[in-house]
Amino acid sequence: MSNINTQTTGALSAEMKTYYGMELLENAKPALVHNQFAATRGVPVGGGKTVEWRKFGSFEKALTPLTEGVTPDGSGISVSYITKELSQYGDYTTVSDMLDLTAIDDVVLEITDRHGANMGLTLDTVTRNEIQQGTKVIYAPTINADGSETEVLHRYELGKANKLTAALVARAATALKKMNAPTFDGKYVCILHPSVAFDLRNDPDWIAAHQYAAATELFSGEIGELHGVRFVETTEAKIFRGKALCQDSFTLTAANNAANGTVTVSEKMAVGALAGRQVLVNGVKVGVLDNTDSMLMLEDNITCAAGDIIYPAEGGAEGGAVYGCLFIGKGAYGVIDLSEGTEVIVKPRGSSGTADPLDQRSSVGWKGVHAAAILYDEYILRVECGSSYSEEDMAN
């Protein structure tokens, strides 16, 4: 915590510098769910804007018996490097006539608390968006009324019938084991959204496993363990869902039959607003080249009938939310240490010179550098699923 600096151009006491810095960091930590499972490293001193992680290869099995008195050839170690450019983030708030330089100020403290939470959410989102790009993915199968399963191959097919189940958890854990992914004290970790956790908690296998077991929480946000996986809940777990297509509506209605690359709709759209978007027409995902106020120009020819419903295709079936549940092995990804390169900046009244001639303004803010990178893609598995709340939750 001593590396969190409070910088001013005025005469803040050493006590206040330390206090505000600690407040910022402590309020950031609860939001940093995605960072707590990363391999951390410090900001490189004199290393420019690039941070580097070393990735070591494995040795082959040494199956050749040793010969007495003969020293065998040793094995070399392969080392590769993963680099990421550092980026700087920050925000501030201007306060009028409120900063007291002689004591801890309640208003500034409250603002610092808010900025600490904002910093945590910002840097956590940067990390989340990076590690959600892993290439290993499983789509939750559709659970039919008779209990049978139907395989799903695309995100846009996922809906409320594609929940995260105990069986799917076991499948994900097995996949990580087969890749020899290291564990966190013998367990893997899954970061999931509360909407997904709701469904999992109602799974009979989860209920049976937690009926008598006393939970031991090791991680912030942990809700329980199943099949060798510890589950950590956060509202910042990734949700994939497209935005509204027309005003506040997530649907459009085909106004007539179509069998080519244009579809006339009944609603009035903002001209050009859907260019570059993806839509679902009769369950087929297609890109939008452009739109008038009543017509979609699509990348491919499609067939639809008057009255067919058109949905956003960036999420799940019928435009619903899809949740990215991250199953993680130890060392899968790396981040910059939060306690380095992060500052809370308090500028008291009178520090701005001619820019504030009447000494009316003070400011409180934060800035920091951050970077995240996947180190071992095979140690991260993303399970994409729907939930009971797929019709309600929005993208984040």
Question: Which role fits each region the language model picked out?
Answer:
Residues 51-56, 60, 65, 76-78, ...:
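Extended assembly-interface regions of large multimeric machines
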